[in-house]
A protein has these predicted regions:
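N-terminal organellar transit peptides
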Residues: 1-105, 109-128, 139-295
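Short glycine/proline-centered loop/turn elements that form peptide/ligand docking sites
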Residues: 132
């Protein structure tokens, strides 16, 4: 053994004796990204929704951690904006392929609709037996105030250039041609959704398209049987089984400070009162999305 090698061995023994990990193999790191709530800027004013601008930076931080072996994605969402879902999905896939890092998703209460699309960004998907999974479809909802205006004696005046500019105006009677046009748009979005699911899940889905792509949703147990997910499991145990007991979990993403939460809440109070309707309707819409899943 050369003098240099002997000195290195001696130096290593000294560092080991004093617990200095300079020569030890670094512990594997799992970055943890959490997506919770409605997708898009439509959620509860106090608890903001999931949108690309707010998550691109944390996603990039996750893939740049040292000693990274995997990015774990926790999902608890009933869905929301297909565009925001797609933007986040694409960024995760782009970095996963660039960095050659596996992504594993874990569904909590729900990974439905856009929430399931986010899960499809992962190479593997796990869920609880009772998680709600699926809802691979498109829904549009709104309100009609025609009779309300009549009762209040209010006349609405709308001036447009272009016959479809005021399509589906909630203060006007619904038109058959407007609904037909909306359905065309929904079919386009649905086709995109189906293409993504098929490209990511492939032959793992063992049931027919007629069963999967109806907008229906299932429990985690049934979704596992269908091939919509890869197994029943939760983050900590699954990651330890894959990467060892000494795996280090590093949550990525900014948590709102107490002051920021108070400032968000002020939208419903004080200087936000004149816009109360714009604030209340998103809360109702968020509740409706969760209620569709029985949650």
């Amino acid at each position: 053994m050369s003098k240099l090698a002997s000195r290195l061995v001696m130096l290593r023994r000294i560092f080991d004796k004093f617990g200095i990990p300079i020569f030890r193999k670094p512990k594997p790191v799992v970055a943890v990204l959490r997506f919770s709530g409605v997708i898009g800027q439509v959620g509860n004013p106090i608890r903001q929704g999931i949108y690309a601008d707010g998550f691109i930076k944390p996603i990039e931080q996750a893939f740049n951690l040292k000693n990274l072996v995997c990015v774990a994605v926790q999902i608890n969402s009933p869905g929301g904006s297909p565009v925001q879902s797609s933007l986040i999905f694409k960024r995760i896939r782009s970095l996963a392929e660039e960095k050659d890092v596996p992504v594993i998703a874990f569904a909590e209460d729900a990974a439905a609709s856009g929430g399931y699309l986010l899960a499809c960004a992962a190479d593997e998907i796990f869920a609880d037996e009772s998680s709600i999974i699926g809802s691979i479809g498109v829904v549009s909802s709104g309100f009609g105030f025609v009779e309300l205006l009549e009762k209040l004696g209010i006349e609405r005046r709308v001036y447009t250039a272009g016959k479809s500019k005021a399509m589906l105006d909630p203060f006007k009677e619904e038109k058959v041609e407007d609904v037909a046009r909306l359905k065309e748009l929904q079919e386009d979005v649905h086709d995109t959704f189906k293409t993504i699911v098929k490209s990511r899940r492939g032959d793992r889905i063992v049931v027919s398209d007629e069963e999967v792509y109806t907008g229906a949703f299932w429990t985690g147990r049934r979704a596992n049987e269908m091939g919509l997910i890869d197994g029943i499991g939760e983050l900590t145990k699954t990651m330890q089984e894959k990467y060892g007991e000494k795996v280090v979990f590093k949550p990525v993403g900014e948590k709102k400070s107490w002051l920021k939460q108070r400032l968000s809440a002020s939208r419903l109070m004080g200087f936000g009162q004149k816009h109360w309707l714009n604030q209340v309707i998103p809360v109702i819409e968020e509740k409706i999305l969760w209620n569709r899943l029985g949650l």
